[in-house]
């Protein structure tokens, strides 16, 4: 969510943050940030999400924009996982082969890592993009994941995607099992 009336940041609410008052800055590498001092926040429901007054959000007379996503069986999945700090990393079940995955460490300062199968069609996925940076893709042996038929697996102990921390993720399906004509 972002105020279009000022130059504030993009703020992210995610089901995987530790409390409803914690938000993530899409333009920064910072860990989750407590925004309870800026007004009340609550977890989004199926029909409602709320904002507080962080960076002008919720201010009367301002124009806002928000992108709202939720898990849809066989199409998209959003959640969190605990990294295992091992090169044989965490496996995250999505129910489909991913087309695009984002991962963000919420316990420590790290980038928003994004992998997709449009630019890299085979494993390991090692051409990430960073949502919080303006540069393009780069080759990275330290931020590799594998796209599997039913989810994705981290193939590194790098703290940005699989250290001993909590991570939020979002994934969209390539050829979802339930809706095989999605993409």
Segments from the language model and where they lie:
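Surface-exposed molecular-recognition determinants
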Residues: 1-183
